[in-house]
Each structure stands twice: as structure tokens, then as C-alpha cells.
Amino acid sequence: MILRYARSEFARIWEPQTRFTIMFEIEAHAADKMAELGVIPKEAARTIWEKGRGVIFSVDRIDEIEREVKHDVIAFLTHVTELVGPEARFLHQGMTSSDVNDTALAVQLARATDLLIEDVDLVLAALKRRAMEHRMTPCVGRSHGIHAEPTTFGLKLAGHYAEFQRTRQRLVAARAEIATCAISGAVGTFANVAPEVEAHVAEKMGLAVEPVSTQVIPRDRHAAYFAALAVAGSAIERLAVEIRHLQRTEVLEAEEPFDPGQKGSSAMPHKRNPILTENLTGLARLIRSAVTPALENVALWHERDISHSSVERAIAPDTTVHLDFALRRLAGVIERLVVYPENMLRNLDRLGGLVHSQRVLLALTQKGLARETAYAAVQTNAMRVWRGEGDFMAFLKADPIVRPHLSDIELADLFDLGYHFKAVDTVFARVFGD
């Protein structure tokens, strides 16, 4: 976990102290149910809570024990015994290490996802506000990076808003899939621990019961979870790349905030670089990098091997922390994005009306020209404009094929910018429901 990207509230989820507290709660809740079932003395279960609740576990001591025993859960339980005393012998009855580790990881991932969903809500709020602000701000739409037809900047942002709505839905679904509890023993048969114990722990920890566990919770759940985070990362990158392109000097339709005192380059004092969105592009790569190892974790040997553990110790904190940072940074960029409507109009007019070529084509076909003939006439004049020979409207008015079919008034109407925005309200109603 890179501290540069970890805000304190999020980092706490992945601190060893938090994990040990969760592990203790799992063990203690299991002991409660075992006491109720008569497996262990009720007084022992009470003592476990009395001596263990709210305790600060010694991470150094647990690490010291683990260096000797080479087993993380045994090291933890040994330290708990040092704190709780003889009653600690009733902990972990019939349980296996993965019962504790997997369930604890599920709690951590669920908590992390709750914060990620809050982050997405920040992005959605910023996108909605700016989309409404620029609902009818004209700009050029581009395909293959080349001018296509007019759109509005609000429509661009509305598309990203809809994408982040889907991102939110995926995170909600991913949380539900990952938030499962397994307390089923060495190979998942409940031979030495009752299913009622699992159900009790699941309820207390806010989890669902894993229907069929082996020694572990099946890793397809984790693969799906990290895939959902990866798609969220790609949604971030798509918007970040859009902003980076719009900030190019020769485009300059929108720009990241640039604060007083900020420096863009150690060598060139004039630079205003899109460093925030470039950073988001890089973080998206890191977030997506978790998917392949998460998928490879699915095919564990038989009832379980440990090959997944080292992977998850890295990708669980790293990926969630990176996504949290990226979402919050993106929300800030959108909230403070500098928009240049005048530059958008200038760029829209840069090709001298070529963005209206489809309307001219359609009008000619509706006047009776064959599509091939109409296309050839419009394209011939458009290519002259591309070569810098003159104005599109003037060429069309002088064209022997176009002129007999379209009057000056009709041609002027075909170049009306507002025509392209007649469905903006419909799209906004679909997206925002307003």
C-alpha cells in the first residue's frame, strides 16, 4: 500500500491492528455460539470477550511469534492466549485458519467497498452539476480523433455520468458477492464445527453465509470483485483521457485546475500540464493489473492451497486504496474543471462547416438524388475545404449537382447548429430523470 495514495480513513481498514481486531471478533462470536450449543463453557466465552474486547494487539509480538511458528493465525492465537489466559484454549474449536482469514478479508473488502461507493457518489454529483451547467454548450464531437458532428459538452459529461452509474451498480453487486462468511472447518464439511456457528458469525459480522466452502471461500468471488474494480478504473481513465485531449494546447476546450503557486515544469515556466489526469491514467493501469492474478487465484488445488494468499495480501489493499484515491481525485478535477466555451465554438467552426456534411447528404437524397451521387458531390466539395481552397457553403452553392436541389435558404438551414441539439433534453431525461 503506497501511503502517497492512502487517505487515513481508508488506510485504517488495512492496518494490521484492524485485521487482528476483526479476527478476534470472528473467533469470539464463534465462541459465543459454541457456548450456546454446549461445545465450550459459557463462562469461557464471557471471559474471552471481557479480556479481549477493545484490546490493542501487539503487532510486533505477533510478528515475533510468526517468525518462529511460520503461521500467521497460530501466531495471532498465541498472542490472544497471552492476553486472555487459559480460557483462550476454547477459541478456534473445530475451525481452520482460512475460516478466520477469509472471513476477515471479506469484512475488510466490504468496508472498503462502502467507501468506494461513497467516492463514486462524489464523482456522480460533480458530473451531474457540470453536465447541467453545460447542457447546451456546443462543441465538436470527434470520431477517430477527427471532427465529426456537433454535440454539447453537457452530453459528453452525461455519457460519463451514465457510465459511473453503472460503475456504482457493479460495486454494489461486487460488495454483495464478496461479503461472505465461511466457518466450515478443514475441508468445508462442518465435521468439527456446527453450521449454526457459521450462521451466527455471519450475522454478527454483517456477511452472508458461503453456500459451499471447501477450506476457503471460492475465489471466483474475488476475481469478480477485482474485475469490477478494474472496470471502475477504466471508467476513470476514459474521462481522464478525454480531459487530457481537450487540454492539448491546440484544442484547449477544457483544462484541469491550475492553482496559484503551482509549477508545471522544472525547465519551462510556461507549462500547465494535465498532471492530475495523467496520474489517473497511471492509477487505472495499476487497478487493472489486479485482475489477472485474481483470476489465476480461482484454480486452487483441491480444497485449498496457499498460492492465493500472497497475491491477495498485495492486491486487496493496493487496488482498493488506488481506486479510492483515483475516484476522489477525479471528483475534484470535474468539480473544478475549467471549461472554455469560446474555444469549443472556434474549434467547431475550424473546418468551415464540414461538420454539417451529413445533413447536406441527407437533404440531397430526400430531394431525389441517388445516395451515391449525393455522397460524391458532398465529398468532392468537402475535400476542397480540407485542402484549404475555400468555404464549404460557397462551394455547395456553386456546385452544379447541389445547386438545382437546394436553395440558399435551405442550405443555410442545413448549417443550423441547433438542429443537432434537439434531443438533448430527451437524453438528459434518460440519464438524470429530471
Residue ranges and their predicted role:
Residues 1-190, 194-200, 209, 262-265, ...:
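A helix-coil-helix interface module used to build multimeric assemblies
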Residues 30-33, 116, 120-123, 127-130, ...:
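Amphipathic alpha-helices that form helix-helix packing interfaces
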Residues 132-154, 253-264, 270-271, 302-311, ...:
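Glycine-rich cofactor-pocket loops
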Residues 198-215, 219:
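Active-site-adjacent "gating/activation" loops or surface patches in catalytic cores
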